[in-house]
Amino acid sequence: MGRAGGRSSYGVCEFALSWHILDGYAAATDLSGLMAVMAGRYDDDEPGSPWRVALYLDERADSTQRQALTRIFLGQLGGTPFRNFASAIGEVYAVRAARIELDHRPDAQRIDAGTYVSVRAAEAIDADGPVSCGIPGHDHPGTEVRTEHLRVDEPPMRWDVSGRCGFATDFGYRSDEA
């Protein structure tokens, strides 16, 4: 599915991932309608390329929902998130509640997580065949986009870049727990 992942374009990958849970549960805890954003970075030349991240959880979530979202997106429940990306997380700088606004519509993609993360996609990139992100285990083809801007302000992570590549797709996550 898609092109195989390889080295990041700049040797250091600075990223923001976002999720809008359309329909989801963690055990009996309803997570439908909630959102999460993860900002992070990794260095291709560092052994194992561990991710250093911050996780932002929808401020509308109650404490039980926040705990479930944290466990899911940091890979503590195993399953698809752990196999797709969370196993690469080496350090977590912060887990915070934030006002999250997402737009995942084609040609309108944007991510806002409080004052910590802001991303705007400028346009889709024409590709020959399906495109998949270099996230380990990623299994859904999607669309490559060029970013208008990607800004993260979560010490020690701080960057504001433009014209970088981005990736948009859907996800279907399941834990290893019943």
Regions found by a protein language model. Name each.
Residues S49-G134:
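Charged linear interaction tracts used for macromolecular binding and regulation
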Residues S9-G11, P47, D103:
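A generic structural signal for short, solvent-exposed coil/turn residues
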Residues L22-A27, P50, F85-G90, H140-T143:
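Short C-terminal domain-edge/linker segments immediately following a structured domain
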Residues V117-A178:
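Extended, charged low-complexity segments
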Residues T29, G90-V95, V145-R151:
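Low-complexity, flexible helical/coil segments
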Residues L17-R71:
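Long, charge-rich boundary regions
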Residues M1-I21:
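N-terminal ordered "arm"
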Residues G2, A39-D43, A98-L102:
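Short amphipathic beta-strand and strand-loop transition segments with alternating hydrophobic
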